[in-house]
C-alpha cells in the first residue's frame, strides 16, 4: 500500500511540475509581446515630440490634440511597463513552485526506492510460491529393449539353420556406404557408396544389424573413434539407409569409355598400325595364315572394310598356295636381271607383295623402323581385290625411264614396283599400232617392267618397248599375257567390273579430315593433262 501511495504522489508531483512549466512558458511569451509594444510606443512618442518642437506654425487646437495624444501614449507606456513587471514576478513565483515540486518528487522517489522490490526479489518470491513439478514423459513407462534382443523371425531362422546343420552362408554382395549424421537434427546423409568384393570382405567393426539376410557393421571413421558408442539400427532405418544409398548410386553412375585422343590420325597405339596407312598387319592379327606362309581359304574372312596390304619379304616360293582372287604380281626376270639380282641380294627383299584379304606373313627380321618409314600411300594398294587372273590389268602410263642391264642403281629403289610377265603398249588412236604392240608384247613375254606412278617414272628394261613408247603420249599397260582393250573403259565401268561396290579401291581413299589423299590428287591432275581418253 505504501508503495502504491508513493507512486501516486510521485505521479502527481510530476503532473504539477509539468503544469508549472507550461505556465512559465506562456508568461514569458506575454512578456516578450509587452516589451515589443512598449518599444514601439516609446519610438512613437519621441517622433511626435521631435515634430512638435520643429513646428511652431500650428494652431492652438492642433497643439492641444498633439498634447493629448502624447499623454495617452505615456500612460500606455507606463501600463505596459507595469504589466511586464507583474509577469516577471509571476514567473519568479512559478519557478519557485516548480522547485518545490521537484524537491517533493525527489523525496517521493527516494522513499519509493527504499520500499520498492527489485526484479530479483520478485523472481525469488514467485519461485518460492510456485512449486516445481517433474515433467512426465509419455515414453518413460516403456522400458528400453535389451541389447541382446532379437526379433522373432531372426530366432526362427537361426533355429532352422541349427536344425538343418547348415554352415553360415557367405556374403554374395558387399557395399561400403559412407554416412554423415547430423547430431542436432538426427538426419543421415549418404556421402558415397563403394561396392566391395564379397571375397575380400571381412567382418570388421561393430555389428549393428543382422536379420539373417543382411548384416550391417559400423566402422570407425579415419582418425576418429565412434562417439558415445554404437547403437543398433532398426529395420526401418536399415531400409531407409539402403534406399538412400541406391539413390546416391543412381545419381552419378560410373561410366567407362575408351581413351580419346585429340588427334585421331596423328597418334596410334603402341603395336598397332591404322588400316588406312600402308596396311602392315600386326603378327597377332594374322588369322588363317600358317607358319609356312600358306593362306587357308576357309579361314579368310570376307572383307567388309577397305582392304590392307601386308608388307612381306620376297621371294615367295609359296605363292601358288595363295587365293586366286588376287592378281599375280610376280615378275620373271631375264638372265641379265637375274645376274644383277645376284650382285644385289637386297633388291628382292625390298619388293612388295599384295595380299587382298588383309592377311600376310610376318617376318621377325622386319623392323618397326621400316614400317614407320613406309606409312604413305603406295601404288600397289590401287590393285582391286576382286580381279581375275584371266582378265588383263589396265594401268596408266605416267612416264618412263631407261633401265639398262648394267645400271648400278637397283630398280627396287623406286616405290611401288609391279612386275608383270607381259606388257602391251596400246594406242587407241591407231589400231595398227595396237596389233604391232600386241605382236611385240608376245615376242617379249619375259620382259621386265617397273612402274611407279607415285614418283611419275616408269622403268622398262626392254629396248624394243622403249622404242615403242616414245611415240604415244596416252598409253595403257596390260598384264598377264592378254590382249589389250580396244576402247578405253571409263572409270565407273572399270570400278563396276572390278567389284567396286563391294571393295572400294584406294584411289577413292579419303583422309579422316575429309580431304583426298595428296598423292591421289597429284595423280588425278597428271591424268587430266595426258588427254581425253585417259582412264
UniProtKB/Swiss-Prot annotation:
It comes from Xenopus laevis (African clawed frog). This is Palmdelphin. The gene is palmd. The keyword Coiled coil applies. Belongs to the paralemmin family. GO terms for cellular component: cytoplasm; dendritic spine; membrane. One of its GO terms (biological process) is regulation of cell shape. Residues 423-450 are annotated as: Disordered. Residues 424-436 have a biased composition (Acidic residues). It comes from the Eukaryota. Its main location: cytoplasm. Keywords: Cell projection, Coiled coil, Cytoplasm, Synapse. Residues 437-446 have a biased composition (Basic and acidic residues). Residues 1-105 form a coiled coil. It is found in: Cytoplasm; Cell projection, Dendrite; Cell projection, Dendritic spine.
Amino acid at each position: 500500500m505504501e508503495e502504491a501511495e508513493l507512486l501516486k504522489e510521485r505521479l502527481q508531483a510530476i503532473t504539477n511540475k509539468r503544469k508549472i512549466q507550461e505556465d512559465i512558458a506562456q508568461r514569458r511569451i506575454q512578456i516578450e509581446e509587452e516589451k515589443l509594444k512598449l518599444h514601439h510606443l516609446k519610438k512613437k512618442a519621441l517622433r511626435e515630440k521631435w515634430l512638435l518642437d520643429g513646428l511652431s506654425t500650428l494652431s492652438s487646437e492642433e497643439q492641444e490634440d498633439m498634447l493629448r495624444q502624447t499623454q495617452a501614449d505615456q500612460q500606455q507606456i507606463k501600463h505596459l511597463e507595469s504589466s511586464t513587471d507583474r509577469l516577471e514576478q509571476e514567473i519568479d513565483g512559478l519557478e519557485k513552485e516548480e522547485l518545490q515540486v521537484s524537491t517533493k518528487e525527489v523525496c517521493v522517489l527516494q522513499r519509493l526506492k527504499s520500499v520498492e522490490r527489485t526484479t530479483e526479489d520478485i523472481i525469488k518470491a514467485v519461485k518460492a510460491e510456485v512449486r516445481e513439478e517433474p515433467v512426465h514423459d509419455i515414453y518413460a513407462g516403456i522400458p528400453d529393449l535389451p541389447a541382446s534382443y532379437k526379433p522373432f523371425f531372426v530366432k526362427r531362422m537361426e533355429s532352422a539353420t541349427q536344425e538343418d546343420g547348415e554352415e553360415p552362408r557367405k556374403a554374395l554382395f558387399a557395399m561400403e556406404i559412407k554416412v554423415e549424421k547430423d547430431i542436432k537434427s538426427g538426419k543421415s546423409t549418404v556421402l558415397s557408396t563403394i561396392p566391395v568384393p564379397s571375397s575380400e570382405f571381412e567382418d570388421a567393426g561393430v555389428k549393428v544389424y543382422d536379420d539373417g539376410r543382411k548384416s550391417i557393421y559400423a566402422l570407425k571413421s579415419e582418425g576418429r573413434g565412434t562417439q558415445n558408442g554404437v547403437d543398433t539400427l532398426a529395420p526401418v532405418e536399415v531400409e531407409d539407409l539402403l534406399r538412400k544409398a541406391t539413390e546416391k548410386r543412381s545419381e552419378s553412375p560410373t561410366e567407362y569409355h575408351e581413351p580419346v585422343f585429340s588427334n585421331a590420325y596423328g597418334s596410334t597405339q603402341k603395336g598397332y598400325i591404322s588400316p588406312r596407312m600402308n596396311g602392315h598387319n600386326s603378327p597377332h592379327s594374322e588369322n588363317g595364315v600358317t607358319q609356312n606362309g600358306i593362306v587357308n581359304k576357309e579361314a579368310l574372312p570376307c572383307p567388309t572394310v577397305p582392304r590392307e596390304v601386308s608388307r612381306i619379304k620376297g621371294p615367295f616360293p609359296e605363292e601358288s598356295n595363295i587365293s586366286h582372287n588376287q592378281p599375280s604380281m610376280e615378275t620373271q626376270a631375264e638372265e641379265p636381271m637375274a645376274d644383277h639380282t645376284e650382285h644385289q641380294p637386297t633388291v628382292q627383299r625390298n619388293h612388295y607383295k599384295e595380299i587382298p584379304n588383309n592377311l600376310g606373313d610376318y617376318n621377325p627380321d622386319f623392323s618397326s623402323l621400316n614400317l614407320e618409314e613406309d606409312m604413305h600411300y603406295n601404288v600397289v594398294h590401287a590393285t582391286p581385290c576382286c580381279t581375275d587372273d584371266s582378265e588383263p590389268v589396265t594401268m596408266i602410263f605416267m612416264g618412263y625411264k631407261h633401265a639398262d642391264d648394267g645400271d648400278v642403281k637397283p630398280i627396287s629403289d623406286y616405290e611401288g614396283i609391279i612386275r608383270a610377265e607381259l606388257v602391251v603398249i596400246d594406242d587407241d588412236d591407231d589400231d595398227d599400232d595396237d596389233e604391232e604392240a600386241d605382236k611385240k608384247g608376245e615376242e617379249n613375254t619375259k620382259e621386265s617392267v617397273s612402274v611407279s606412278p607415285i614418283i611419275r617414272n616408269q622403268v622398262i628394261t626392254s629396248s624394243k618397248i622403249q622404242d615403242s613408247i616414245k611415240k604415244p603420249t596416252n598409253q595403257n599397260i596390260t598384264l598377264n599375257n592378254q590382249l589389250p582393250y580396244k576402247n578405253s573403259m571409263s572409270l565407273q565401268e572399270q570400278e563396276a567390273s572390278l567389284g567396286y561396290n563391294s571393295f572400294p579401291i584406294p584411289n577413292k581413299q579419303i583422309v579422316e579430315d575429309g580431304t583426298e589423299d595428296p598423292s591421289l590428287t597429284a595423280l588425278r591432275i597428271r591424268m587430266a593433262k595426258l588427254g581425253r581418253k585417259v582412264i
